[in-house]
Amino acid sequence: MRKAKPKKRQILPDPVYGDVRVTKFVNHLMYDGKKNTAFSIFYGALDIVKTKLSNEEKSALEIWKAALDNITPQVEVKSRRIGGATFQVPTEIRPERKESISMKNLILYARKRGGKTMADKLAAEIVDAFNNQGAAFKRKEDMHRMAEANRAFAHFRF
């Protein structure tokens, strides 16, 4: 076992909005250390979101944050082996993991989408998540449904 808990790395806020959550999202979006490319994809997606939802009184960043909140799961199931049987035990998710899961799901399902550029796909997924639909929102609903179905095993603790 390690002697001490490793220190959390400080994440700097992004240059345009000054928001740490944006930088975390871009870090998940980034491939091969190409952060500038990831930033341009993200900002391009927000511009597309702004044009798509121009009648909305919120800014593109607020729409993105609302979309993330809509696809953030509250509970997940973990496998726990007891007496030769494996049970799916519903557990609460800690806040950092909730944020991370929602960001990863948004990016994953944006990548799976059909579309021209990644910015287009990401913008479409953000708009869908904002409107409580799309693949990332469906994933959250599935996670909650699994937890609800296995509520009988909630007394097994980790």
UniProtKB/Swiss-Prot annotation:
One Gene Ontology MF term: tRNA binding
Name the SUPFAM superfamilies for this protein. Ribosomal protein S7
Q: Which keywords label this protein?
A: Ribonucleoprotein, Ribosomal protein, RNA-binding, rRNA-binding, tRNA-binding
* Gene3D superfamilies, per database record: Ribosomal protein S7 domain
Question: Mind telling me which InterPro entries this protein's record contains?
Answer: Ribosomal_uS7 (IPR000235), Ribosomal_uS7_bac/org-type (IPR005717), Ribosomal_uS7_dom (IPR023798), Ribosomal_uS7_dom_sf (IPR036823)
Function, in words:
One of the primary rRNA binding proteins, it binds directly to 16S rRNA where it nucleates assembly of the head domain of the 30S subunit. Is located at the subunit interface close to the decoding center, probably blocks exit of the E-site tRNA.
Record PANTHER family: RIBOSOMAL PROTEIN S7 (PTHR11205)
> What is the name attached to this protein's record?
Small ribosomal subunit protein uS7
Native organism is Porphyromonas gingivalis (strain ATCC 33277 / DSM 20709 / CIP 103683 / JCM 12257 / NCTC 11834 / 2561)
Taxonomic lineage from the root:
Bacteria, Pseudomonadati, Bacteroidota, Bacteroidia, Bacteroidales
The gene from which this protein is expressed is rpsG
